[in-house]
Amino acid sequence: MGEDAAQAEKFQHPGSDMRQEKPSSPSPMPSSTPSPSLNLGNTEEAIRDNSQVNAVTVLTLLDKLVNMLDAVQENQHKMEQRQISLEGSVKGIQNDLTKLSKYQASTSNTVSKLLEKSRKVSAHTRAVKERMDRQCAQVKRLENNHAQLLRRNHFKVLIFQEENEIPASVFVKQPVSGAVEGKEELPDENKSLEETLHTVDLSSDDDLPHDEEALEDSAEEKVEESRAEKIKRSSLKKVDSLKKAFSRQNIEKKMNKLGTKIVSVERREKIKKSLTSNHQKISSGKSSPFKVSPLTFGRKKVREGESHAENETKSEDLPSSEQMPNDQEEESFAEGHSEASLASALVEGEIAEEAAEKATSRGSNSGMDSNIDLTIVEDEEEESVALEQAQKVRYEGSYALTSEEAERSDGDPVQPAVLQVHQTS
């Protein structure tokens, strides 16, 4: 571009020189006419001058365009830089807006929570206000009552709690007379309560300024007297109920009930029948003073219901046939045994019961023969063994007699011997 500008300047300078030279040339000959050769040269020079002028103008225009394009490019670069800076600022603004939106969401959540809490607090405050209003009303009522009491300035509070008594119906059913007595005693208690309540004076100090102390003393004395009377009555009732519960008649009734539960009426009748029949048979078949229980090793099975009854029958038959003159010695021997000997005697009685069933099933003659055969004594050692067994059998008989007497006494509740029998057993 710089070279083009220099060439354009060169072309401009010779043209100006030629123009300066042209007017100087025709000045010497103004009156002469130009020749045709001169005219041709002038036209060519004019064409050349015009072409040079056009080239210079084009070059100048091109230079201007180049300068304008350079300026435009520079402006575009500046605009691009500005656009980049604007984009960065816009991105920052967008980030700030997103942050603001997040903060706005969090603030909206917190505000909603605060609103809920405020609603709850308002509800609680309303409830508290209602409670406070109620309490205020109650306090006002209490204040009014207190003011009334202060105006009266003379009041008493009586606290009474009746003691829990032992009901006699737990032990024994009381007759109608006991209920009548209780009805008669209740109005007395009510009367005493009414008397104590009437003694309380609720008058004011203005009405009775001088007689207050005397009235208080009399009321306290009456209250103490009524309490002492009630305590005495309750203690007497308890003692009476205990006496009635543990009276002789009640104990006998209970013992009779236990006897009926243990041994039924049917079993008693069976025992009596078996006692009468077996007693006659064994008394007729008595052979020697040394009696041994017959057939002690029996294997016959017996029903459970009749085992106890037959045990008593057998133990009753054997000593009845062998009543010895030394009854006092037998009683002392029976009382000297312990509870362990009682258990062994019961076991032997069961064995004897089984043997008795076998003996009764057989004929009376065969029973007598077997008893005679078993009671034959050959040596002195056998005699000593027989004596020991006879003593055991006698003890069993005494125990069976006591049990039979107890059962008979159960049938007759009036007899007082029931307690003595149980004590000895």
Swiss-Prot record:
Transmembrane segments: none annotated. Residues 61-82, 125-154, 210-268 form a coiled coil. Residues 62-100 are annotated as: Leucine-zipper. Induction: Up-regulated in asyncronously growing fibroblasts following serum deprivation but not following contact inhibition. Down-regulated during synchronous cell cycle re-entry. It is found in: Cytoplasm, Cytosol; Membrane, Caveola. The leucine-zipper domain is essential for its localization in the caveolae. Belongs to the CAVIN family. This is Caveolae-associated protein 2.
